[in-house]
C-alpha cells in the first residue's frame, strides 16, 4: 500500500510540475496572432490597441502596416526614405517578396501607398525562445515620398536611458481587447514606462526581462498593445524608444507590455541602414 501511495504522489507532483512549467512558458509570447511566432502561412486578424482611441495617421506619420498577401500582420516605423523598423518575430521565416508595407493611411486595408520590401535584415542575435533582440530592418524597393502623413521618426542615441514613469504613445491596428474584434482604423494609447526591476518581477516566471527590453503600461491594466500591434512604435518625446514585442495577454493587471528597447541597438541600425 505504501508503495502505491508513493507512486501516486510522484505522479501527482510530476503533473503539477508540468502544469507550472507550461503556465510559465505561456507567459512569454509575442504579439501577432495566434500568440506564437508568425509563419508565412498564418493569417493575422485585424486586432488592435486595447483601451485606446482612434487617431489619424497624420498624428503618427511614422506608422506603417506590414502586410503579407495584402493582410495586416504587424506594425512598423519609418526610419528613412528606404528603411522600416519592425519586430524580428514579425519577419522570421519570411521572404522579402512576400511582404509589403502600407504607409500614409489610417486604414491598413486601403489608402496611402503600398511599397514592396526588397530586403529583410533581422538582428543576428534574435532568439525565438526568449524573444530577445526582437528587431528587424526592412529595406524598401523604392524611396518614400514624405508628406504630412508619411514621416521618419527620430531615434535615441546609443544606450540613451529611458526614465521611469514617462508617458508614451503606442499605436497600431491590433486588438482592442484580448478577444477578436475586427476594425481597420488606426488606434493609439498612452501608457507610462515601468521600472525595469518591477517589470522583471512581473515576468520572473518567464525568465524575466533582458537589457534589450523595456516595459510600459498601468499596474491595473486596461491599456496596452495587443495582437497585430507587434513591430509597431512606442514613442516618447518624439523619439522611437521601443518596438512592440510581447506580453502576458493584453492589458492584464500586473503585466505591462514588453517592448524591444531601441537605444541598445542604435549603432546596429546606423551600421545597417545609415540612419
UniProtKB/Swiss-Prot annotation:
GO terms for molecular function: serine-type endopeptidase activity. GO terms for cellular component: extracellular region. The keyword Disulfide bond applies. Residues 19-48 form a propeptide. CDD domains: Tryp_SPc. It holds the Pfam family Trypsin. Its main location: secreted. It is found in: Secreted. Gene3D superfamilies: Trypsin-like serine proteases (2.40.10.10). One of its GO terms (biological process) is digestion. Disulfide bonds join 74-90, 199-215, 226-250. InterPro entries: Peptidase_S1, Peptidase_S1_PA, Peptidase_S1_PA_chymotrypsin, Peptidase_S1A, Trypsin_dom, TRYPSIN_HIS, TRYPSIN_SER. Residues 1-18 form the signal peptide. The active site is at 89 (charge relay system), 134 (charge relay system), 230 (charge relay system). It comes from the Eukaryota. Residues 49-274 form the Peptidase S1 domain. The record marks 224 as: Required for specificity. Its EC number is 3.4.21.4. Belongs to the peptidase S1 family. Constitutive trypsin that is expressed 2 days after emergence, coinciding with host seeking behavior of the female. PANTHER family: GH13245P2-RELATED, POLYSERASE-RELATED. This is Trypsin-4. It comes from Anopheles gambiae.
